[in-house]
Swiss-Prot record:
One function term, GO molecular function aspect: ATP binding
Keywords: Aminoacyl-tRNA synthetase, ATP-binding, Cytoplasm, Ligase, Nucleotide-binding, Protein biosynthesis
Motif ('HIGH' region): 71-81
Biased composition (Basic and acidic residues): 1-11
Name listed for the protein in its UniProt record: Leucine--tRNA ligase
Top-rank taxon, per record: Bacteria
Length: 855
C-alpha cells in the first residue's frame, strides 16, 4: 500500500515541479488561486440553484440511483467519511454530466447504542445528542460539496420513518417471518443487550462494546431469514462482476450451506429418536459415541433422567459452558471438556450402543445440537475421544501419495479426513466417498431412519434489543398471547426519556414506563402490556434506500411506482465492514418485499464499491493510539477541493490509504495550475474548436474518452492522472504553442473544468465562470468525444542531455531511429546544452526517448 501510494504522490509532485517557474510568475500578478474564497463564493450559489435536485416532474432523462451508505451521527465527519463521500460523489457527478437524472440522497442511521450510551454518560436526552450531531454532520457535508439532493433527507429516529419499520415488522409477522421464541442468545454483559450472531466478532467479543460475549436464555423476536437461505446464496451468482469478490465470498461462507443427511438415532429410555445432521453419512459405521451441546434443551432433558451425581456434574458443567463464547468453544487449540450423561443412543446401521456425552465443542444452534462422533476421521472428535478414553474405529482407508496407508489415528493423534475407500462398513465396503454417501442415504431412507438434507451456518436474525433508543416493537401481550398493533394505530411512539433509567440492566428501560407499557388490547380492550424491546437498528437500514424515492409520503413506506422507476440502486458505495450485516439483511428484506408484491426486483444494489480504510502511520485511526486526523483540521489547512482530489488520487479506491503518505498540498498546487488555465484563455465562448491546434485537440478528446472509462471502472486515481496530463499539455500550448487565444485551448480548458468538477467542484465552478459560462458546471454536460481524434497522430519524445531533459518533441509514432536522431540533434535547446562539444554516444528509443552523452 505505502509504496504504490508514494509513487502516485511522487507523480503529482513531479507534475507540479515541472511547472514551478510559470506558476510563480502567474501568482505574482495579484490573481492567485484562493481555495477558501472559492468555497465562500460558490456554496451559496449551489444552495440557491439546487443543481442536484432529482426526480423533477417532466424530467425525461434516464434515471441513475447512486447511494452512499448513510452515516451514524456519532460526531463530526472523519477521514473515513471524507474518502467515502468523495468517491461516491465522483460517481454521482459523472452520471449527472453524462445526461442522467441522478438521485443521490443522504440520511442518518440515527437510532442505536452510541446515542443511548452518550446520553447516559452526559445526562442528555438521546434525541438531543443525535440531532445535534446530525446538524454538525450536515453542515460539514454541505461544506464538503457533497452532491446530495437535500430535499430527500431522512432520519431513522423520526417517527415518520420508524412508523414504517413497524409496518415492515407487521408484514413479516403476517407472513410468518417474524416470531418470538425462547432460546440461548448472545449476551453483551457491558451493554446489557442481546446481539445477533453477525454482531459477535471472530474473537468472541461484541463489535460495539468489546466485551466477551456469553450465552443467556431469553425470549426474543426473530426474523426468519433462514427461509431465504437458498435464494440469498444462489442469487449471489447474479452479482458476480458487479460486487467485490470478497463480499460475495464472505456472504457465501456466512450462509454456509452444506449437503448431507439427517440420521435418526434411537435413545434408550426415550420415545422419540434424536436427529443428527452429518455431511458424511457414509462414515456411520465409525461412530463410537454421541455428543450433544451442553447448553441445549436436549442435554438438559437427557440429564434429568440420569442419577443424581451425573445430573449434578452436568449442571455445574452447563453453567461453565454458558459463560464461554462460541468462538472459544469451537477453537481447535482448546482442551476438550465434557461430561457423560449416563444415557445411550443406538446406531441405526449396526445397532451398537453409543454413550452420550455433553460437551462444549458442539453448539446448540448447529443442526439439532447433537452429533455422531466419528473420531478416526474428525479431529475434534478424535481429540475428545483421546481425552476421555473412548474407542476409535477406522472406516475410511486413506492413503498417502505413494499409496501407503496413513497411521492409525488412535495412535498418531491425527484424524484421517481425506478421501479414501470405505472399510469396516458392511455393504458400503469398497465404495469411494461420493458413492458411499449416496448409498448410505439410499439405505437410510429405505429403512425410514434418515433422509437427504441440507444444513446452513446462517441462523435466524435476532432483532429485539433491551435498550431505549430504537424502534418499539408493535406488539402487545395479553393473557391470551401476543397481539400485533393494527396498522392504523402506527406509529407506536417512543415515550420521552425523562424519568427513565437508561443505564443497562438487562431489561429494556421501556418496561419501566408504566403509562406507556400498560394499554388496552387492540382486539378486545382487555389489559395488555406493550412489548418493551426495541428493534435492531439493522432493521432501519435494511430498507432505507427504498424510502428515499418518496421520503415525505405519509401514506406508505415507499411509492411503488417511483421505486419501479428508480430501483434497484444502480451504484452503492460503502465499507466492507458491512459485508455480512447490513448487506445480507438488505438483500433479505428486498426479497421479502418482492415476494409480497411491493417491488419488481429482488436484489437491492446492482453494483457495489467498497472503499478502503483511512489509516495513519500504518494503523487504524483511534483515540487510544492518539493518531486520529480530524477532517475539519484538514479542511482548514488545505481546503475542500484538495482533500477531495487527494482521496481520489491516492490509489485504487478499494485499497487502504495511509494519510501519512499522501499530499493534499500537492493537490492544492495542481488545482492552482488548473484554475489559472481558465484565467488565461482569451478566446470567446462558442468559438469553433475544429479550427484550433490539432495536437492539443487530440489530447483533450483522448482525455475525455479515457476518463470516462476509468471512472466507470472505479479507477479514479488514473482518471486524475489523465487530467493532469491534459493540464500540462494545455499549459504548454498556452506558453510555447499556439497561445491562449487558440480555440483548441478553450476547448481543452472547458473539458478540464468539466472533468475537474467530479473531483474538485469549487475550483471547477470558478473555472467555468472565468470561461464565461453561467453556473452550474455540474450540469454542463460531458463534452462529446470526436472519435477521429482518438487516433494519436503524434507522440511526445523526451530528449535528454547527460540524463537531464532538455526538450520535448512531437513526432510521428512511426518515426525511424535515424530520423529521430537527426531531429533531436537539430533542436536549438539540445545544441545549447551541448555547447559545441563532440558526441560520445546517442541512444535512440523511437519514438519516445533520445539520450545524448557528450564527449
Amino acid at each position: 500500500m505505502r509504496d504504490a501510494r508514494t509513487h502516485r504522490e511522487d507523480e503529482m509532485t513531479q507534475t507540479d515541479t515541472q511547472a514551478t517557474g510559470p506558476d510563480r510568475a502567474e501568482e505574482q500578478d495579484g490573481q492567485r488561486y484562493d481555495a477558501f474564497a472559492l468555497q465562500e463564493k460558490w456554496l451559496p450559489v449551489w444552495d440557491e440553484r439546487k443543481p442536484f435536485r432529482s426526480g423533477e416532474p417532466g424530467d425525461e432523462r434516464p434515471k441513475k440511483y447512486v447511494l452512499d451508505m448513510f452515516p451514524y451521527p456519532s460526531g463530526d465527519l472523519h477521514m473515513g467519511h471524507a474518502e467515502a463521500y468523495a468517491l461516491g460523489d465522483v460517481i454521482a457527478r459523472y452520471w449527472l454530466q453524462r445526461g442522467f437524472d441522478v438521485m443521490h440522497p443522504i440520511g442518518w442511521d440515527a437510532f442505536g447504542l452510541p446515542a443511548e450510551n452518550a446520553a447516559i454518560k452526559r445526562g442528555l436526552d438521546p434525541r438531543r445528542w443525535t440531532y445535534d450531531n446530525i446538524a454538525q454532520q450536515r453542515a460539514s457535508m454541505r461544506r464538503y460539496a457533497c452532491s446530495f439532493d437535500w430535499d430527500r433527507v431522512l432520519h431513522t429516529s423520526d417517527p415518520e420513518y420508524y412508523r414504517w419499520n413497524q409496518w415492515l415488522f407487521l408484514k413479516l409477522y403476517e407472513k410468518g417471518l417474524a416470531y418470538r421464541k425462547d432460546s440461548l442468545v448472545n449476551w453483551d454483559p457491558v451493554d446489557q443487550t442481546v446481539l445477533a450472531n453477525e454482531q459477535v466478532l471472530p474473537d468472541g467479543t461484541s463489535e460495539r462494546s468489546g466485551a466477551k460475549v456469553v450465552k443467556k436464555k431469553l425470549t426474543q423476536w426473530y426474523f426468519r431469514i433462514t427461509e431465504y437461505a437458498d435464494r440469498l446464496l444462489d442469487d449471489l451468482d447474479t452479482l458476480e462482476g458487479q460486487w467485490p469478490a470478497k463480499v460475495i465470498s464472505m456472504q457465501r461462507n456466512w450462509i454456509g450451506r452444506s449437503t448431507g443427511a439427517e440420521v435418526e438415532f434411537a435413545i434408550e429410555g426415550r420415545d422419540e429418536p434424536v436427529t443428527v445432521y452429518t455431511t458424511r453419512p457414509d462414515t456411520l459405521h465409525g461412530a463410537t459415541f454421541m455428543v450433544v451441546a451442553a447448553d441445549s434443551d436436549l442435554a438438559e432433558e437427557l440429564a434429568a433422567g440420569a442419577p443424581d451425581d451425573v445430573r449434578a456434574a452436568f449442571e455445574a458443567y452447563r453453567t461453565q459452558v454458558q459463560e464461554t463464547s462460541d468462538i472459544d468453544r469451537l477453537s481447535s487449540e482448546r482442551e476438550k471438556t465434557g461430561v457423560p450423561l449416563g444415557r445411550y443412543a443406538v446406531n441405526p446401521v449396526n445397532g451398537e450402543r453409543l454413550p452420550i456425552w455433553a460437551a462444549d465443542y458442539v453448539l446448540a444452534d448447529y443442526g439439532t445440537g447433537a452429533i455422531m462422533a466419528v473420531p478416526a476421521h474428525d479431529q475434534r472428535d478424535l481429540d475428545f475421544a483421546r481425552a476421555f478414553g473412548l474407542p476409535v474405529r477406522v472406516v475410511v482407508d486413506v492413503r498417502d501419495d505413494d499409496g501407503n496407508p496413513l497411521p492409525d489415528p488412535a495412535e498418531s493423534g491425527t484424524a484421517t479426513a481425506g478421501d479414501g475407500v470405505l472399510v469396516n462398513s458392511g455393504a458400503l465396503d469398497g465404495l469411494g466417498k461420493q458413492a458411499g454417501i449416496a448409498k448410505a442415504i439410499e439405505d437410510l431412507t429405505a429403512a425410514g431412519k434418515g433422509r437427504a438434507a441440507k444444513n446452513y451456518r446462517l441462523r435466524d436474525w435476532l432483532i429485539s434489543r433491551q435498550r431505549y433508543w430504537g424502534t418499539p416493537i408493535p406488539v402487545v401481550h395479553t393473557e391470551n398471547g401476543e397481539v400485533p398493533v393494527p396498522e392504523d394505530q402506527l406509529p407506536v411512539l417512543l415515550p420521552p426519556s425523562e424519568g427513565l433509567n437508561l443505564t443497562p440492566k438487562g431489561t429494556s428501560p421501556l418496561g419501566a414506563a408504566e403509562d406507556w407499557v400498560n394499554v388496552p388490547s387492540p382486539v378486545d380492550g382487555s389489559p395488555a402490556r406493550r412489548d418493551p424491546d426495541t428493534m435492531d437498528t439493522f432493521v432501519d437500514s435494511s430498507w432505507y434506500f427504498l424510502r428515499f424515492v418518496s421520503p415525505h409520503d405519509d401514506t406508505k413506506a415507499f411509492d411503488t411506482d417511483l421505486i419501479a422507476q428508480w430501483g434497484p440502486v444502480d451504484q452503492y458505495v460503502g465499507g466492507v465492514t458491512h459485508a455480512i450485516l447490513h448487506l445480507l439483511y438488505a438483500r433479505f428484506i428486498t426479497k421479502v418485499l418482492h415476494d409480497l408484491g411491493y417491488l419488481p426486483f429482488d436484489e437491492p444494489f446492482t453494483r457495489l464499491l467498497n472503499q478502503g480504510m483511512v489509516q495513519m502511520d500504518g494503523s487504524a485511526m483511534s483515540k487510544s493510539k492518539g493518531n486520529i486526523v480530524r477532517l475539519s483540521d484538514q479542511l482548514e489547512e488545505h481546503g475542500v477541493d484538495a482533500i477531495r482530489l487527494t482521496m481520489a488520487f491516492a490509489g485504487p479506491p478499494e485499497d487502504d490509504i495511509d494519510w501519512a503518505d499522501v499530499s493534499p498540498s500537492g493537490s492544492a498546487k495542481f488545482l492552482g495550475r488548473a484554475w489559472r488555465l481558465a484565467r488565461d484563455v482569451t478566446s470567446e465562448p462558442g468559438v469553433d474548436p475544429t479550427t484550433g491546434d490539432a495536437a492539443l485537440r487530440s489530447v483533450t478528446h483522448r482525455t475525455l474518452h479515457e476518463v470516462s472509462q476509468h471512472v466507470e471502472a472505479f479507477r479514479f486515481n488514473v482518471a486524475v492522472a489523465r487530467l493532469m496530463e491534459l493540464v500540462n499539455a494545455t499549459r504548454k500550448a498556452i506558453d510555447s504553442g499556439p497561445g491562449a487565444g487558440d480555440p483548441a485551448v478553450r476547448e481543452a480548458v472547458e473539458a478540464t473544468a468539466v472533468v475537474l468538477s467530479l473531483f474538485a467542484p469549487y475550483a471547477a465552478e470558478d473555472m467555468w465562470s472565468l470561461l464565461g459560462h453561467d453556473p452550474c458546471v455540474a450540469r454542463a454536460g460531458w463534452p462529446a468525444v470526436d472519435e477521429s481524434l482518438l487516433v494519436q497522430d503524434t507522440v511526445t519524445c523526451v530528449v535528454q542531455v547527460q540524463g537531464k531533459v532538455r526538450d520535448r518533441l512531437e513526432v510521428s509514432p512511426d518515426i525511424t531511429q535515424d530520423a529521430l536522431r537527426e531531429l533531436a540533434l537539430a533542436s536549438e535547446k539540445v545544441q545549447a546544452a551541448l555547447g559545441g562539444r563532440d558526441l560520445r554516444t546517442v541512444v535512440v528509443r523511437a519514438p519516445k526517448l533520445v539520450n545524448i552523452v557528450p564527449a
